[in-house]
Amino acid sequence: MKGTIIKGIGGFYYIKIDNSEEIIECKARGKFRHTELTPMIGDYVEISIDKNNKGAIEKIYERRSELFRPAVANVTQALVVFSFKNPDINIDLLNKFLLLCEYNNLKAIVCFNKMDLVNKEDYKDIISMIEQAGYDIIFLNAKEERNMDIIKKLIKDNVTVFCGPSGVGKSTMLNKIIGKETMITGNISEKLKRGKHTTRHSELIYVDEGLLVDTPGFSSLDINFMEKEDLLHCIPEFRDFIGECKFTGCLHHREPNCAVKKAVEEGHIHKNRYDFYIKTLEEFMNRRKKKW
């Protein structure tokens, strides 16, 4: 049988079987320890059931993506939630979230919540910057469920994680989407009698024909693990111009005859996005100098 790990706790993994609402408790075979491959929430797996009706994970299929905070595999999209007011928007922080989405090969959709607090026209430059970078935008008021139907449609056939700074309404959005529906994961704790004081772990919730990570993603925004070459490929609007620069390996920094810098000057790339790239690149380069 095949299915998706929707929860893992205390060495036990709970697999939702394909085309079924059945959830089977499994342990991982010891062979995974030798390969240093630990099952993760979101893994697509093959399992076996022995004569005592005990489940075991036999195979973990190749992961399309892998997050570590929270630890979830095969996430397909991130809803990057921000507000213009309460809290005020931090453009560098938004760009950093988008950077991490690109690095993790996630489709990012920017959601601006609390739109009842602002006039959209006052933020048209920020909106233009995001659209120019190629990202879709959804304007929300989650408390009043404005455009939440769009979010629910996006969740279908995807594994979705919410991310964004504190206070922007991620929990409200999650609660509105999950609601009081009867979800197949909802009775796991009751069924297994594990107790109320078990350590909290992320899990996947099956809702609207998709899977939803029940805790916000990217709890750490540390990007120091990245290299400057990674950064170069995590700014999607640069891609049309890579290869047109005079120098192979151009970092679009101080090099002459740079196609990216020319695109910025001509308005094809938003200056704020380029400035964020340069600021981050210089931080990476200074960090490397300190190592030596």
Curated annotation (Swiss-Prot):
Coiled coil: none annotated. CDD domains: S1_YloQ_GTPase (cd04466), YjeQ_EngC (cd01854). It is an enzyme of class 3 (hydrolase). The keyword Chaperone does not apply. Its main location: cytoplasm. Residues 64-221 form the CP-type G domain. InterPro entries: G_CP_dom, NA-bd_OB-fold, P-loop_NTPase, Ribosome_biogen_GTPase_RsgA, RsgA_GTPase_dom, RsgA_N. It is found in: Cytoplasm. It comes from the Bacteria. GO terms for molecular function: GTP binding; GTPase activity; metal ion binding; rRNA binding. Transmembrane segments: none annotated. Its cofactor is Zn(2+). Keywords: Cytoplasm, GTP-binding, Hydrolase, Metal-binding, Nucleotide-binding, Ribosome biogenesis, RNA-binding, rRNA-binding, Zinc. Zn(2+) binds at C245, C250, H252, C258. The keyword Cytoplasm applies. One of its GO terms (cellular component) is cytoplasm. HAMAP family: GTPase_RsgA (MF_01820). One of several proteins that assist in the late maturation steps of the functional core of the 30S ribosomal subunit. Helps release RbfA from mature subunits. May play a role in the assembly of ribosomal proteins into the subunit. Circularly permuted GTPase that catalyzes slow GTP hydrolysis, GTPase activity is stimulated by the 30S ribosomal subunit. This is Small ribosomal subunit biogenesis GTPase RsgA. The gene is rsgA.
